[in-house]
């Protein structure tokens, strides 16, 4: 482990002891907001401290086993035991080191939030819409594995199956490091390209088509409240499904336009106009916040191009090659030959690799900052 990381962990331990004292102080207990904030910080620091304690313990075990091996020159049985313990300790240390590095990465407060996932068909016509349906299935299956709640906010099915566009909301508990739906799926934003033989292809030729995905953190309710109602144009219309067949005979579908930015959100999934309006306003708020974030990120990117990318829709991030059973993430040069499993929601390896790559970037930035550059 690099010295600056160990120094950071030592400071975390000192902070944990400080939090123990603060949480028992009368003035803190009487201030509910401060008490909650410190309790959350204590919970996160405790997880880090537990892992760091395990790391130092295994490092001590490794040193002891190496000493035993040095003294066991004439005792093959003891030498074998020592070598076995050395191998096990090194494996544990490597895993704990990686876990701690991820824990030390500065937390994005949005990582714990629920998220809106927007999937849009792009180039490729009907095949692109079918692939949008496949991505919808992939993400919902991944949500099931994580026991997240999934809600369809709006959908525009294509006539041959799949979607021209579909917007989902996903919510669920955070993991031990405080990462929730948005933190897991944030790196899915961008262009997704598929190479396969379409069901409608009679000559067996491989076609290439594409979809775009945008993952937006759900903003606080306060953000939605800050939108000036005078800046909104609200239109209602009859909800309809594929082929233009009416789902109901009332104007329950809602389209909201934010006039200053031209951003539009709509919802027709619910029979209640009131609930559709509330959902559309949620999506609109998320898109406005994301527009602001994207503009700031673009300015930052002009100074430093990140490995994982900006998350812009125009970034081609991934290729799904069905004939070869191959998925390639172009941002980190990751190639996996388990495409069918991934399409069934087995996204864990992909997401972890992206988180590790982004973490390495952030750790490099931390090290640079700690060295005073």
From Swiss-Prot:
Function comment: Peptide chain release factor 1 directs the termination of translation in response to the peptide chain termination codons UAG and UAA.
Source superkingdom: Bacteria
Main location: cytoplasm
Keywords from the UniProt entry: Cytoplasm, Methylation, Protein biosynthesis
Protein name as annotated: Peptide chain release factor 1
Organism expressing this protein natively: Polaromonas sp. (strain JS666 / ATCC BAA-500)
Alphabetical list of Pfam families matching this protein: PCRF (PF03462), RF-1 (PF00472)
GO CC terms in record: cytoplasm
């Amino acid at each position: 482990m690099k010295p600056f990381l160990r120094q950071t962990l030592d400071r975390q331990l000192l902070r944990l002891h400080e939090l123990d004292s603060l949480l028992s102080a009368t003035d803190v207990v009487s201030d509910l907001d401060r008490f909650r904030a410190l309790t959350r910080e204590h919970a996160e620091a405790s997880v880090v401290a537990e892992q760091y304690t395990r790391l130092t313990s295994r490092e001590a075990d490794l040193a002891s086993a190496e000493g035993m091996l040095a003294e066991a020159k004439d005792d093959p049985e003891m030498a074998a035991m020592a070598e076995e313990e050395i191998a096990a300790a090194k494996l544990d240390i490597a895993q704990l080191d990686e876990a701690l590095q991820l824990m030390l990465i500065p937390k994005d407060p949005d990582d714990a939030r629920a998220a809106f996932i927007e999937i849009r068909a792009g180039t490729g016509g009907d095949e692109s819409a079918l692939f949008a349906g496949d991505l919808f299935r992939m993400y919902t299956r991944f949500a099931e594995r994580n026991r997240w709640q999934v809600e369809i906010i709006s959908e525009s099915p294509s006539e041959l199956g799949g979607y021209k566009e579909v917007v989902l909301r996903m919510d669920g508990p955070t993991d031990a490091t405080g990462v929730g739906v948005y933190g897991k799926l944030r790196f899915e934003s961008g262009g997704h390209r598929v190479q396969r033989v379409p069901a409608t292809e009679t000559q067996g030729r491989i076609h290439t088509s594409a979809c775009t995905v945008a993952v937006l953190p759900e903003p606080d309710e306060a953000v939605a409240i800050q939108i000036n109602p005078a800046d909104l144009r609200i239109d209602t219309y009859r909800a309809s499904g594929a082929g233009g067949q009416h789902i109901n005979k009332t104007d329950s579908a809602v389209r909201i336009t934010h006039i200053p930015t031209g951003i539009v959100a709509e919802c027709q999934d619910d029979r209640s106009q009131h609930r559709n309006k509330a959902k559309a306003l949620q999506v609109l708020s998320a898109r406005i916040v994301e527009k602001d974030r994207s503009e700031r990120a673009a300015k930052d990117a002009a100074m430093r191009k990140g490995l994982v990318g900006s998350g812009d829709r125009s970034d081609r991030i991934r290729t799904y090659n069905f004939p070869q059973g191959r998925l390639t993430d172009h941002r980190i040069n990751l190639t996996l030959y388990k495409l069918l499993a991934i399409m069934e929601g087995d996204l864990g390896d992909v997401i972890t690799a992206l988180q590790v790559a982004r973490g390495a970037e952030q750790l490099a930035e931390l090290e640079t900052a700690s060295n005073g550059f």
